[in-house]
Regions:
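Nucleotide-activated sugar donor-binding and catalytic core shared by glycosyltransferases
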Residues: 1-422
Length: 422
């Protein structure tokens, strides 16, 4: 499908879907002792899983059941939400292929742990959050032992390599979508699904954005949070600043990192670069200082959109992957914000190989300065955030998780409760 056709398909899906997700009814679970297994593989997923865990406890009580026993894969945040964690895949998260290959024995062990838990603890439902590379194989194991699977934060198969959905729909009983056009796509591929809204809106409700960024002067660089991302993106971003400095010599620039894990790497790339400050652990504060941003394509774009910050989006593509992406990519934009808006609100640049940083720098100047382009972006960001729905995604997701227990077939329940013991 050509670009115009892809744009039209997304816009049609947005028009056909209700703006606000619905709160489902609770099943009658009076007196039922439930065991629920949650899994998250990265820090961002753990935040959403922890919020979901708390809502599951509240929803079970509201449905007449005692507090459920929560088991799972995750870290300290998930434990603080009441989950007994059996391992922490987030501590092993990696993006480069060499690192992932080295971790294969660890991930194989996770699959074995899940299988053992399905046999010994007989969970009523398995709830993986995001991270399909790990969770689709896990879902297959849960299905093998008759445990229904509700996947919260569905994979973006609609963006590239959509054929992967064939395996997905075989191992997932219910997919919980977070973007307003996703449900129509999963409907077309016969995947049972429900739109619950974006979980980041729950966090936004807890910390409303400060007044708009028009009276600020800082440019924020968001190169990603992993080693490979930083090494690929940060030097290119710094080079793009040359065009900004030519127009605004004294503009303050900040690089934001959520943790100090890669502080030495960032400082090594910075070298003697002047006028750039590294900030660690204060994303919210940095967003509150920013007038404009240059960011990698990823979940952080939802945060800049929440703050109304005009942003240039960078997506680096190696020459080796260029041809493959052309054949697999099925969306007109890389950024989720643009996809939700149904148009290119944030200017996007897919840079192949070394590329030329000048166009990015020039675009950054245009959105930094007052003018029609900046105003148009800010209007589009408001529209995109409205389409994500309001807060309550975790509450809606928890009700869907409990609701699937009502529809469990006698055959599956027998398979779950009589799973092999060895």
């Amino acid at each position: 499908m050509q670009r115009n056709g892809l744009c039209a398909a997304i816009q049609s899906d947005l028009e056909d879907f209700p703006a606000e997700p619905q709160l489902p009814d609770l099943p009658d679970l009076k007196g039922r002792a439930l065991t629920i297994f949650l899994s998250c593989a990265e820090a961002s997923g753990e935040q959403h899983a922890a919020r979901l865990a708390r809502e599951l406890i509240a929803a079970a009580k509201e449905a007449g059941a005692p507090a459920p026993r929560l088991l799972g894969f995750g870290g300290a945040e998930l434990e603080a939400a009441g989950v007994t964690t059996l391992a922490d895949p987030g501590a092993r998260a990696t993006m480069d292929a060499g690192g992932a290959m080295a971790q294969l024995p660890y991930y194989r062990g996770l699959l074995e742990t899940l299988a053992t838990t399905c046999i010994e603890d007989r969970p009523d439902v398995f709830v993986p959050v995001d991270s399909p590379a790990l969770h689709v194989p896990m879902a297959s194991i849960a299905q093998r032992y008759g445990v229904p699977v509700v996947h919260h934060i569905t994979p973006q198969y609609w963006a590239w390599a959509p054929w992967r959905v064939r395996r997905y729909k075989q191992v997932v009983d219910l997919a919980l979508t977070i973007l307003p056009f996703e449900s129509a796509w999963f409907d077309r591929h016969d995947v049972p699904n429900a739109f619950v809204g974006h979980p980041i809106r729950d966090a936004h409700a807890e910390r409303p954005a400060p007044p708009g960024p028009d009276d600020r002067d800082t440019i924020l660089l968001l190169p990603g949070s992993r080693a490979k991302e930083i090494e690929d993106n940060l030097p290119f971003m710094l080079a793009a600043l040359d065009a900004v400095r030519a127009a605004h010599p004294d503009v303050p620039v900040r690089i934001t990192q959520r943790t100090a894990d890669h502080e030495e790497r960032v400082r090594a790339i910075l070298g003697e670069t002047q006028g750039v400050t590294l900030s660690i652990g204060d994303l919210e504060g940095d967003l509150g200082r920013a007038r404009a941003a240059l960011a990698v394509s990823g979940t952080v774009l939802t945060e800049v959109a929440h703050h109304g910050i005009p942003t240039v989006v960078l997506y680096r593509v190696t020459k080796r992957w260029k041809r493959a992406l052309r054949s697999m990519l099925t969306v007109p934009w890389f950024s989720g914000v643009n996809l939700v808006a149904g148009e290119e609100v944030l200017p996007e640049f897919a840079v192949i190989g070394d590329g030329d940083p000048l166009p990015l720098g020039q675009a950054l100047v245009r959105i930094y300065e007052d003018g029609p382009e900046r105003a148009k972006i800010q209007t589009g960001l408001k529209r995109a955030m409205h389409r994500l729905g309001g807060p309550g995604a975790a509450r809606r997701a928890a009700r869907h998780v409990l609701g699937i227990l009502d529809g469990r077939s006698p055959e599956r329940e027998q398979k779950r409760t009589q799973a092999p013991t060895a």
